[in-house]
């Protein structure tokens, strides 16, 4: 159910504070949170007045989002992007004010998408290990990349740059070494921060520092704070060349004023001017569509009648555990779950809130905050994959504006 702008559901409170709905219910029972009283509303919302005592809500209610989005580059800032995919990160950075000079991507369908939308972009379609970046040495302001993180063996030793040879981490580090950009932005799954107790990330950070960079930011960003209607989380690493460390100061972007929902993505409103256009998409087999019709909005397999739940889950039904992604239907009034490379995968179901079908490709794109005129190339499966792997455009925009502000504030000699 949709509440007034100064009222928030338990689900939105939980998402914002990174706690479970059960936590919110417990706080309500012990008086830490007191929902608004309205006999006409079954689900009692929480008000702005009591939520602003939480740091996350206070930051939203007192945000400088509009002022930060209004900042324009004071000079031309150049961008190189690695592992560019379908262009979510590059597009957001373009909207922030960066000018792309080179994008590298090996997937032919993603490259076709990039060229269809930005014919003027210099898209290098090749494996990154075949690309020479030395001609850009000292000429690039920002290098970015969402590098796929492959496992590497360290066997108790302290690894350096050459020890990572053969991995995509090495190739991104090589590009940084050859280009020597003023700033780099690396993004990855949030799990990288916890992999091997943080050892993998520590090795990557050390290699980047050994190449002559200081880390300004190393944090997991929640996309819901940056005008993205999706519970996506990404590890963001921002580094600056050591000789510029005392001249550049990064400040994390302010959050958007509210958490957007699936309804904001698919219906006309503050995110899009019109309802989502029709587009291609996968369909369920007839029996699966029948089964999903029993799942209520926001529900999952545990909401199925017991007989149907056993049929659908098979052996998994008896194994216990949450398995909350199975037979999962999205809710209109909550952000989407993190999009994956296919909306109909059994373990990570992404069913439309009110229709018994997977999300279409354009619905997928909207939840990732791509504009409706961004055209994707390839088969339906390839398009889902491109969108599911992308950085949300609005998240990239927010980070890009923060980097623009940092560069604008730098002394002139940084660019001489």
Swiss-Prot record:
Q: Which CDD domains does the entry link to?
A: Cyt_C5_DNA_methylase
Q: Where is the SAM-dependent MTase C5-type domain?
A: 77-410
E.C. numbers: 2.1.1.37
Its domain of life reads: Bacteria
Q: Which residues form a coiled coil?
A: none
Swiss-Prot/TrEMBL keywords: DNA-binding, Methyltransferase, Restriction system, S-adenosyl-L-methionine, Transferase
Picking any one GO biological process from the record gives: methylation
The record lists the catalysed reaction(s) as:
a 2'-deoxycytidine in DNA + S-adenosyl-L-methionine = a 5-methyl-2'-deoxycytidine in DNA + S-adenosyl-L-homocysteine + H(+)
Q: Which GO terms label this protein's molecular function in UniProt?
A: DNA (cytosine-5-)-methyltransferase activity; DNA binding
Broad class of enzyme this protein falls into:
transferase
**Cited InterPro entries:** C5-Methyltransferase (IPR050390), C5_DNA_meth_AS (IPR018117), C5_MeTfrase (IPR001525), C5_meth_CS (IPR031303), SAM-dependent_MTases_sf (IPR029063)
**Which residues catalyse the reaction?**
149
- Family in the record: Belongs to the class I-like SAM-binding methyltransferase superfamily. C5-methyltransferase family.
Q: What is this protein called?
A: Type II methyltransferase M.PspPI
Q: Which gene encodes it?
A: pspPIM
């Amino acid at each position: 159910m949709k509440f007034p702008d100064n009222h928030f559901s338990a689900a939105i409170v939980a998402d914002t504070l990174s706690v479970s709905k059960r936590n919110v219910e417990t706080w309500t029972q012990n008086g830490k949170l007191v929902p608004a009283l309205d006999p006409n509303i079954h689900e009692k919302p929480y008000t702005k007045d009591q939520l602003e005592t939480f740091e996350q809500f206070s930051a939203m209610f007192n945000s400088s989002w509009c002022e930060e989005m209004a900042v324009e580059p004071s000079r031309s800032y150049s961008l190189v992007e690695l592992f560019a995919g379908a262009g979510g990160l590059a597009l957001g950075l373009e909207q922030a004010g960066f000018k792309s000079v080179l994008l590298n991507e090996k997937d032919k369908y993603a490259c076709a998408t990039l060229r269809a939308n930005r014919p003027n972009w210099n898209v290098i379609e090749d494996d990154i290990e075949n690309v020479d970046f030395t001609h850009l040495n000292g000429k690039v302001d920002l290098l970015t990349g969402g590098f796929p993180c492959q496992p590497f063996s360290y066997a108790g030793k302290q690894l350096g740059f050459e020890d990572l040879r053969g991995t995509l981490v090495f190739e991104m580090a090589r590009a940084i070494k050859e280009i020597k950009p003023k700033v780099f932005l690396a993004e990855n799954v949030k799990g990288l921060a916890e992999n091997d107790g943080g050892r993998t990330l520590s090795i990557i950070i050390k290699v980047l520092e050994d190449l002559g960079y200081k880390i300004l930011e190393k944090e997991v960003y929640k996309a819901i704070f940056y005008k993205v209607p999706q519970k996506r989380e990404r590890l963001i690493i921002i580094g600056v060349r050591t000789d510029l460390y005392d001249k550049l100061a990064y400040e994390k972007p302010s959050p958007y004023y509210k958490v957007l929902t699936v309804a904001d993505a698919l219906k006309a409103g503050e995110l899009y001017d019109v309802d989502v256009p029709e587009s291609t998409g996968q369909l369920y087999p007839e029996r699966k569509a029948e089964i999903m019709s029993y799942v209520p909005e926001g529900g999952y397999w545990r909401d199925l009648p017991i007989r149907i739940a056993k049929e659908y889950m098979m052996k998994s039904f008896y194994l216990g555990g949450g398995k909350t992604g199975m037979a999962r239907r999205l809710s209109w009034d909550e952000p989407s779950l993190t999009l994956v490379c296919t909306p109909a995968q059994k373990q990570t179901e992404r069913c439309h809130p009110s229709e018994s079908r997977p999300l279409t490709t354009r619905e997928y794109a909207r939840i990732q905050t791509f504009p409706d005129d961004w055209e994707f190339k390839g088969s339906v499966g390839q398009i889902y994959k491109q969108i599911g792997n992308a950085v949300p455009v609005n998240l990239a925009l927010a980070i890009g504006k923060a980097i623009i502000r940092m560069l604008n504030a730098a002394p002139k000699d940084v660019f001489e």
